């Protein structure tokens, strides 16, 4: 499917909605792995910039050793972004660069973290969930800001490290508001695929240090994408 800049947004939304509707019944919010066997965790993030009227993006994937938290690999991709930003359909814009970066990996992550949502999405198809079907790996969404769905606000958790409140919409748990660090704003965790919410929370908390409220792989991927964007813009 090739989509050029002269897009018909209505047709794109129809096509993208159809794909999301076909994939969403295949989501499994249960672990397909043993947590003791996790060795490598990847963080994925993207950054964008404009050159004249053309949008460009860069994706960075950082892999850490789950035990030592040391970085074991970093890869990048970059290129033109022909697909416009349409709320609820971010995956279609970001996945080409993500897949290009994944192809460069020499290590095989056991789990991918995404700077964004997974099940916490209008159709349960945030970037973390959508990407799982192409990566064939468990995924977790970690968002810095809250995606408000059906006018439901999140409930602020206690000001204690590890405290959380579930995000419940129409009697269904979509995700979790998690305070990873005391006296710091919470983050929003949601399952991507092939993992449950309690395990997602445990793994996120095991990747928190004193430097950020974000888990280490996500924070490092965020830093690297901004460095790469600066380098590419200056080059």
Curated annotation (Swiss-Prot):
Highest taxon of the lineage:
Bacteria
Q: Where in the cell is it found?
A: Cytoplasm
Primary location? cytoplasm
Q: Which GO terms describe its cellular component?
A: cytoplasm
Cofactors needed by this protein, per the record, are: Mg(2+)
What is the reaction catalyzed?
A: Endonucleolytic cleavage at apurinic or apyrimidinic sites to products with a 5'-phosphate
The cross-references to Pfam families, in alphabetical order and at most eight, read: Endonuclease_5
Mind telling me which CDD domains this protein's record contains? Endonuclease_V
What does the record give as EC number?
3.1.21.7
Print the keywords alphabetically: Cytoplasm, DNA damage, DNA repair, Endonuclease, Hydrolase, Magnesium, Metal-binding, Nuclease
The UniProt record gives the binding positions of Mg(2+) as 45, 115
Enzyme's top EC category: hydrolase
Q: Does the keyword section mention Metal-binding?
A: yes
In which family does this protein belong, per the annotation? Belongs to the endonuclease V family.
Q: What is this protein called?
A: Endonuclease V
Q: Which organism is it from?
A: Bacillus thuringiensis subsp. konkukian (strain 97-27)
